[in-house]
């Protein structure tokens, strides 16, 4: 008897050659980080964006605080019931809302 079935062994596929990263070019850190670093200005460019943050805030605070008074305590009632982010809504009277009893619900007859 001779076996005429198809072979179950398959030759491995040839792998495609991929150049390693050092051959392609240098890896940039912004490709892999979530934070975006500000671009540093070159020597010939003036640094117009760089200012002392404390000096900038002082100028803003002087104009903003002149027309505003003390803030009212609007959150005093909310502090008694901290929300956890998983709060469920209760009914208008504070009791839990249960689904209606199917025996009590009247169905409209056709």
UniProtKB/Swiss-Prot annotation:
Tree of life domain: Eukaryota
UniProt cross-references to SMART domains, sorted A to Z: GAGE (SM01379)
Listed Pfam families: GAGE (PF05831)
Comp. bias (Acidic residues): 32-45, 87-96
Cited InterPro entries: GAGE, GAGE_fam
Coiled coil: none
Region Disordered, residue ranges: 1-110
Cystine crosslinks: none
Other notes: This gene belongs to a multigene family expressed in a large variety of tumors whereas in normal tissues, expression is restricted to germ cells. These genes organized in clustered repeats, have a high degree of predicted sequence identity, but differ by scattered single nucleotide substitution. Their sequences contain either the antigenic peptide YYWPRPRRY or YRPRPRRY which is recognized by cytotoxic T-cells.
Protein family membership: Belongs to the GAGE family.
Protein name in UniProt: G antigen 2E
Gene name, Swiss-Prot/TrEMBL: GAGE2E
